[in-house]
């Protein structure tokens, strides 16, 4: 059986990997992506809470006695 010559395998594999890398870079470069994706603004629906329906007394903080 003849011996398989593997001396050129390293350069072949290296060149294939480099070529694939360049091809994918060019493919990605041509594709366009949105610059700044903005989240959609959803309108906020105001839901009334049970404690909002009732009148509540708001107390002011204690003030110092005036002389």
Swiss-Prot record:
Entry-annotated residues carrying N6-succinyllysine: 54
Domain of life according to the entry: Eukaryota
Localization in the cell: Mitochondrion membrane
Protein keywords: Acetylation, ATP synthesis, CF(0), Hydrogen ion transport, Ion transport, Membrane, Mitochondrion, Transmembrane, Transmembrane helix, Transport
GO CC annotations, alphabetized: mitochondrial membrane; proton-transporting ATP synthase complex
Transmembrane domains' residue ranges: 8-24
Major subcellular location class: mitochondrion
Disulfide pattern: none
Membrane topology: Single-pass membrane protein
Gene Ontology terms describing biological process: proton motive force-driven ATP synthesis
Single GO molecular function: proton transmembrane transporter activity
Residue positions where N6-acetyllysine is found in the record: 54, 57
Function: Subunit 8, of the mitochondrial membrane ATP synthase complex (F(1)F(0) ATP synthase or Complex V) that produces ATP from ADP in the presence of a proton gradient across the membrane which is generated by electron transport complexes of the respiratory chain. ATP synthase complex consist of a soluble F(1) head domain - the catalytic core - and a membrane F(1) domain - the membrane proton channel. These two domains are linked by a central stalk rotating inside the F(1) region and a stationary peripheral stalk.
Family: Belongs to the ATPase protein 8 family.
Subunit structure: Component of the ATP synthase complex composed at least of ATP5F1A/subunit alpha, ATP5F1B/subunit beta, ATP5MC1/subunit c (homooctomer), MT-ATP6/subunit a, MT-ATP8/subunit 8, ATP5ME/subunit e, ATP5MF/subunit f, ATP5MG/subunit g, ATP5MK/subunit k, ATP5MJ/subunit j, ATP5F1C/subunit gamma, ATP5F1D/subunit delta, ATP5F1E/subunit epsilon, ATP5PF/subunit F6, ATP5PB/subunit b, ATP5PD/subunit d, ATP5PO/subunit OSCP.
Name recorded for this polypeptide: ATP synthase F(0) complex subunit 8
Organism: Ailurus fulgens
């Amino acid at each position: 059986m003849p011996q398989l010559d593997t001396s050129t395998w390293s350069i072949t594999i290296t060149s294939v990997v480099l070529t694939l890398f360049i091809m994918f870079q060019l493919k990605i470069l041509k594709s366009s992506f949105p610059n700044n994706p903005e989240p959609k603004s959803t309108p906020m629906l105001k839901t009334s809470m049970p404690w909002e329906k009732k009148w509540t007394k708001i107390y002011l903080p204690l003030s110092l006695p005036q002389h």
